């Protein structure tokens, strides 16, 4: 039976909110909050993959296993691919990528992403989505939208409003029932991860700044389904951080 590991990519120099991995949330750095949330699961191991000695030292101080990676990776998946190679995981194993800025991610969704990849043998990656309930989220580029086929394989991810509803110019007229927000959790087959860094980086990945588009561009399948539980958005801005702080202080 394949082992299932969780890897949390943690980059110190984030663009929109610098040093957010170390941002204080109710007395603990965010990376610790994420680690402690993930530790409630029953997976074989939890590893933090970081390019920062500072994050490494702090993470090890609260008992995390850490892999130090290069600082020139284009995406979290590239960072995880390096970590997986260093850790020597077996090709048949599964790695779940839990973003280091999602301290409120439900454990059920992590388990769901892993099980989906087990069930969908044609896919090399699995991920989750949820229905959009606020029309403003359709036009917010920080909310990545996804469309998928009848067999629950992703067709495209975009920061734009997809699908485009032709003939409707006013937001109030749009039927939002067919719009889905991508949840940034991924499960990968280790054999694929070891190959990921060799794949062609496509123009669409650069335009959208979405690493999962490299998978689709190179002809691989991403399985997707609606999440078991609603997932709060990750921390990308100071406003997001303040919202999470309020939730932890309740």
Swiss-Prot record:
It is found in: Cytoplasm. It catalyses: 3-deoxy-alpha-D-manno-oct-2-ulosonate + CTP = CMP-3-deoxy-beta-D-manno-octulosonate + diphosphate. One of its GO terms (biological process) is lipopolysaccharide biosynthetic process. Pfam families: CTP_transf_3. It is an enzyme of class 2 (transferase). Keywords: Cytoplasm, Lipopolysaccharide biosynthesis, Nucleotidyltransferase, Transferase. One of its GO terms (molecular function) is 3-deoxy-manno-octulosonate cytidylyltransferase activity. This is 3-deoxy-manno-octulosonate cytidylyltransferase. The lineage of its organism: Bacteria, Pseudomonadati, Pseudomonadota, Gammaproteobacteria, Thiotrichales. The gene is kdsB.
